[in-house]
Amino acid sequence: MAFNVTILTIFPEMFPGFLNYSLAGKALEKKIWNLEVINIRSFAKDKHSTVDDVPYGGGAGMVMRSDVVGDAVDSMLSVHKNTKFIYMTPSGTKFNQNIARELLEFPHITILCGRFEGIDQRIIDAYTPYELSIGDYILSGGEPAAMVVLDACIRLLPGVVNNTDSITEESFNYGGGVLEYPQYTRPEQWKGYKVPEVLLSGNHKKISDWRQKQSHVITKKRRPELLSGEINDKFT
């Protein structure tokens, strides 16, 4: 069964964007995943296609209107009643590899991409989307964040990556969720740097032990919370 995605955005021309290239693009051509893009501006109430307004209580920026966004959501739900509805927001649960895997369990997901100062809170209250963040920083809109989420999901789909070992041995999958070990290829020497001898030995046990040790060292140095389990890795 294909992985089906609907995007709600005021910039439909941004999609599929970089998802139209490389592995994700080929998978889209093969219909391993399907993309539908809905233009929120189509549900605007005036001739200027206005989707935002000033915030009640004052403050900087503009807020996306609940009536406009709500009509777009209602239109989507009339077709995709069992979709998993997601809203990209910096205040959401931080996205990770486990969430990417769990998203694939849903036959259809919908991602709402905000702009300006975000969406009217009543959209969240009325539809209770799963609020998702890709990190502790601010983008101009939810579209790039949505593409990041989708790229992480798509590459896990069967038939997208030819060599499945490429997935199982990379960061957050390898060795119980730690960071990946260093990789080397030809030439054996470059600018005075040599490939570690163990990787040239042909001894698979020693190579495996070296890689596990390197993964542990790198993870302990850069992401110790992955070793301690102090990370929210569940999609709820």
Curated annotation (Swiss-Prot):
- Cysteine-cysteine disulfides: none
NADP in keyword set: no
SUPFAM superfamilies named among the record's database cross-references: alpha/beta knot
Question: Where in the cell does this protein reside?
Answer: Cytoplasm
Methyltransferase as UniProt keyword: yes
- The primary location reported for this protein is cytoplasm
The residues listed in the UniProt record as binding S-adenosyl-L-methionine, with positions renumbered to this chain, are: G114, I134, G135, D136, Y137, I138, L139
Tell me the function of this protein. Answer: Specifically methylates guanosine-37 in various tRNAs.
Q: Which GO-annotated molecular functions does the record name?
A: tRNA (guanine(37)-N1)-methyltransferase activity
Which EC number(s) does the record attach to this protein? 2.1.1.228
Question: Which Pfam families does this chain map to?
Answer: tRNA_m1G_MT
Quote the cellular component terms of the Gene Ontology held in the record: cytosol
* Family from the record: Belongs to the RNA methyltransferase TrmD family.
User: Per the record, what are the reactions this protein catalyses?
Assistant: guanosine(37) in tRNA + S-adenosyl-L-methionine = N(1)-methylguanosine(37) in tRNA + S-adenosyl-L-homocysteine + H(+)
How does it associate, per the subunit comment? Homodimer.
Q: Where on the tree of life does the source sit, at the highest rank?
A: Bacteria
What keywords does the record list, in alphabetical order? Cytoplasm, Methyltransferase, S-adenosyl-L-methionine, Transferase, tRNA processing
Query: What lineage, starting at the top, does this entry show?
Result: Bacteria, Pseudomonadati, Pseudomonadota, Alphaproteobacteria, Rickettsiales
TM region(s), chain numbering: none
Its recorded name reads tRNA (guanine-N(1)-)-methyltransferase
Q: What class of enzyme is it?
A: transferase
Gene Ontology biological-process annotations: tRNA N1-guanine methylation
